[in-house]
């Protein structure tokens, strides 16, 4: 099982982040039905009010779980992911992806 953490940095302004979240809302149910997908959740900062938290108001962090790299690669080639990428290209500045496996 692989865990993918994708940090998506949007253009400044709440409307850009919301536009990306709206696009995720459209595809999450479909992605969760893909073969090999065990989790797919867009996350945003929680204003916890603690001193040790860093906030990124123009970021979305995707937490994904995939059975294998092959399943992840197939996911990236689906029509709904291609449509998502096209829909958000004006709102997203950059994306950093980490693919993780259990450390112990």
Curated annotation (Swiss-Prot):
Its EC number is 1.-.-.-. SUPFAM superfamilies: Dimeric alpha+beta barrel. GO terms for biological process: response to acidic pH. Does not appear to require metal ions or other cofactors for catalysis. The reaction is insensitive to heptyl-4-hydroxyquinoline-N-oxide (HOQNO), a typical inhibitor of single electron reduction reactions. InterPro entries: ABM_dom (IPR007138), AI-2_Isomerase_LsrG (IPR050744), Dimeric_a/b-barrel (IPR011008). Residues 2-100 form the ABM domain. One of its GO terms (cellular component) is cytosol. Homodimer. PANTHER family: ABM DOMAIN-CONTAINING PROTEIN, QUINOL MONOOXYGENASE YGIN-RELATED. This is Probable quinol monooxygenase YgiN. It comes from Escherichia coli (strain K12).
């Amino acid at each position: 099982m692989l865990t993918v953490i994708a940090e998506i940095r949007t253009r400044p302004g709440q409307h850009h982040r919301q536009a990306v979240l709206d696009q995720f809302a459209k595809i999450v149910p479909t992605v969760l039905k893909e073969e090999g997908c065990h989790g797919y959740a867009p996350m945003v900062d929680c204003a916890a009010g603690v001193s040790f938290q860093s906030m990124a108001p123009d970021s979305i962090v995707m937490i994904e779980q995939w059975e294998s790299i092959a399943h992840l690669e197939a996911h990236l080639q689906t029509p709904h992911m291609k449509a998502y990428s096209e829909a958000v290209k004006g709102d997203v500045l950059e994306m950093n992806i980490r693919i993780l496996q259990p450390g112990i």
